[in-house]
């Protein structure tokens, strides 16, 4: 499926060549779509199995990011969980875990609903993806690398109609449609597990 017919012909043979090339293209697209669906289903099942029975919030957050970031080619990630604010009438987002996170002491990081992209996603319940970030916005750092990500995706995690958490991932590449679909579907499973932990 990696080749096309490339002969110089006219008439009926040209039509036949064009039809064959069209069929090859369709078959190639169908095969690729099938691979993406297999990848999606396999990884959703793997994460579901991995999260099953988890009762510790911090362990869940760390495990999720450790497995999720490399799978979707993210080099950095954080997860914030929703909790009651001090006045109990408001909800806020508390930093739970990070993956290659540069941000200092996690327990000190709290965001209000509507504050920054993470807070906005929590307030609206809608995924936000930003591509081609300006230089200097946030940095992905390692011993050899200090680079701005190309794409950031912020995903609401909900159980029924309640926001339970927000996951933010940054990548040096743009997130693909398949990765985005996977993250959206996975967020529902994460919401169920977070609700179960909260209830126990």
Language-model features, listed with the residues they occupy:
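Short beta-strand-to-loop transition segments that serve as allosteric relay/switch motifs
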Residues: 9, 99-102, 145, 165-175
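Amphipathic alpha-helical "output/dimerization" segments
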Residues: 15-22, 26, 159-162, 174-195
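Signal-transmission linkers at sensory-effector interfaces
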Residues: 22, 29-53, 196-200
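GAF sensory/regulatory domain recognition
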Residues: 66-69, 76-109, 113-115, 135
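Signal-transducing coupling segments at domain and membrane junctions
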Residues: 101-106, 131-151
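A short, aliphatic-rich beta-strand micro-motif
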Residues: 150-158
